[in-house]
Amino acid sequence: ENVALTIGSQSAFFFLFNMLGGEHEDGTHQKILLPITPEYIGYSDVGLTTNLFYSYQPVIEKLDNHFFKYHIDFDKLTVRENTAAMCVSRPTNPTGNVLTDEEMLKLLAIAEQHDIPLIIDNAYGEPFPGIIFTETKPFWNNNTIFCMSLSKIGMPGTRTGIVIANDLIINSIRNMNAVINLATANFGPM
């Protein structure tokens, strides 16, 4: 009920962003909020409409030995009236920054408060063991959409995306899959 497979996580984001954001029948233009930048550049290619995203710059914490960590600037983060969903990658691509559990809990609370989904791109992260080296706790509730990818865990030929979400989102993805790609790829000889 809560899992759908796609032909890679990129197609999952194509489905999700265009299903939730963009032009709607009532004439509104819904947007996807990226709470922190830099963020995965590949998101910019999946929208069927222009101006699909808006985002915020991070707060930068300087660490020892010329290292730094950046965090979501919750003081500036605003969910607009036309926000359809929030999306973060954990860890972020391209920098590998891992949002803290505290940041994730705040994002979940904001998503629930505004009754919008929080899309979490876990292509490089939880729940697969040994992929990231920061202690994290996976989260899920009815407002959460997890996207994962088998290609990022050492199986690049599989092109299989995994979406975990509420049954309404999953049924919509299954319906889109039936039209666009009918079935995910099989492993075949490897």
Segments from the language model and where they lie:
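Conserved core of the PLP fold type I
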Residues: E1-H114, I119-W140, I145
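Conserved core segment of the aminotransferase class I/II
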Residues: T28, L48, W140-M190
